[in-house]
Amino acid sequence: MGEALRGLKRTIMCGEPRENNIGEKVTVMGWVQRKRNLGGLIFVDLRDRTGIMQIVFGEEINKEAFEKSDNVKSEYCIAVTGEIVKRQSPNNDMETGAVELKGEDIKILSESETPPIYIKEGLDASENVRLKYRYLDLRRPDMQKIFMIRHKTCKVVRDFLDENGFLEMETPILTKSTPEGARDYLVPSRNYKGMFYALPQSPQIFKQLLMVSGYDKYFQITKCFRDEDLRANRQPEFTQIDMELSFVEEDDVIDLNEKLLAKVFKEVAGIDVKLPIERMPYKIAMEKYGSDKPDLRFGMEINDLTEAVKNSEFKVFKGAIEAGGSVRAIKAENCATMGRKQIDKLQDFVKTYKAKGLAWIAYKEDEIKSPIAKFLTEEEMKAILEKMDAKVGDLILIVGDKNNVVFESLGALRLHLAKELDIINKDEFRFVWITEFPLLAYNEEEGRYQAEHHPFTAIMDEDIDLLDTDPGKVRAKAYDIVLNGEELGGGSIRIHDSKLQEKMFSVLGFTKEKAWERFGFLLEAFKFGPPPHGGLAYGLDRMIMFLAGTENIKDVITFPKNQNAFCPLTEAPNVVDENQLEELGIKKIEKED
């Protein structure tokens, strides 16, 4: 049984003592990292979240403490009181390496079994074991650094927004299900049997209602929930830095958030963000990079070859152009020597993005090699090489198809090749705002338009008339902030006119009755003088990944789920008692074989 503190107070953290503390009598508390018994002396490295302190016990220092210290093992939780002295053999690899603590008294607060994982940096244990024993995983110094970064980030964000007149306000967690997009997590109601709350996918509607309420600058750091299939770096519950402002336009929201990003990245990670951040319309991003989340740390931009091959008799190119598509290409420098097997793998790669194939031209020193050369005239080949600014040693990779297939396949191929060729500067941070998103996307399966972002996004002023005549061409007052090919956050100016909002619901295929059934409370609120407003939300978890330099979202969440949305630690979700289900009016139906 562990000893009680009995009034003993910690006076200094393990990672704090320096030479200016020599001579001080202190008490430290923490976990035993390791113990070394050298006969007449016992050395213990004691760890807490600030670092490690070496403690020396000896018969000449205190015989009772010396004998007691011999009983401690790794991960025992102990308290030690003694004097800070100069270390005879300094350890320059430790921040406290110039000093050590002479152990005059020791309390063993609790013992530890042999841990199933080593408490050290750079752990190579399996993810499942780490998640099952997450409380031990979180003791590791590299994990503790991450959560100190997370804390500091939240503090910097709160301080900045407070200084800029924002109010931190909370919105409901139990709310109404308005299915449009990802699936909701549903919570059954005991009082209203057969009815359900939904956990919020975002605070979107409530923060708009706060604008109607006159709280013109709102923010919160809040949990959101989406019941979707978990891809890499997705979690069913995640944290947003959410904000909304009244009486603003796009530039106002963007300018404020550039200052916020610059402050966060500088103060938390020492990274300078060059302002103003580049802005790029969605159309340009797709045409040049094949993605609305372009990674700008390398070139390999997509070029349009449609004009150069518009008269080509090559069936793939001709068919794509006649069908209203295009022919486009990327250039892989110094890759003309790539073997046929490697190119075949690239062809298989683009086919996963529905491309029918991948044409290629290798610009070698003594020849231009290509399986499509026989289908191209000399003028067409020359035009392609000029358009691509090709030089000896370059490999040109071409896709001809519908535009969306061309963009998606070449955009993915561009990223794939950059990683394979190792041409991405991992120390660079390239921000870009993507603007002028399409407002709508047509769902061919359902035969209707769907909102690209959400149904509350405002329309660019010059495109309002297109909502009646050509909805697919309407652009939104929406903006995403992208960093190194990852979406860091996104937002928009919102519709604040009830008639326009009703019209938007109509374009999305909602009857008036259905729109009022789902969103009547918002439409009703818009009858009472709503201000122009807009906002933005960041994925805090993804932001911390960049600031902490990790590529795994589970590293930045204290108790994450695995790829199957299961918690190995608590074994949630779990079966509940029948009486709990009965109270909720729920009956389980067994699946038939």
Curated annotation (Swiss-Prot):
Positions with a binding annotation for L-aspartate: 180, 226, 453, 494
GO process terms (BP): aspartyl-tRNA aminoacylation
Q: Which residues are ATP-binding?
A: 226-228, 235, 487, 539-542
How would you classify this enzyme at the top EC level?
ligase
Q: What keywords is this UniProt entry annotated with?
A: Aminoacyl-tRNA synthetase, ATP-binding, Cytoplasm, Ligase, Nucleotide-binding, Protein biosynthesis
The record's annotation in PANTHER family points to: ASPARTATE--TRNA LIGASE, MITOCHONDRIAL (PTHR22594:SF5), ASPARTYL/LYSYL-TRNA SYNTHETASE (PTHR22594)
Family per similarity comment = Belongs to the class-II aminoacyl-tRNA synthetase family. Type 1 subfamily.
Main function: Catalyzes the attachment of L-aspartate to tRNA(Asp) in a two-step reaction: L-aspartate is first activated by ATP to form Asp-AMP and then transferred to the acceptor end of tRNA(Asp).
**What does the subunit section of this Swiss-Prot or TrEMBL entry state?**
Homodimer.
Q: Which HAMAP family match?
A: Asp_tRNA_synth_type1
What protein name applies here? Aspartate--tRNA ligase
- Organism this protein belongs to: Clostridium botulinum (strain 657 / Type Ba4)
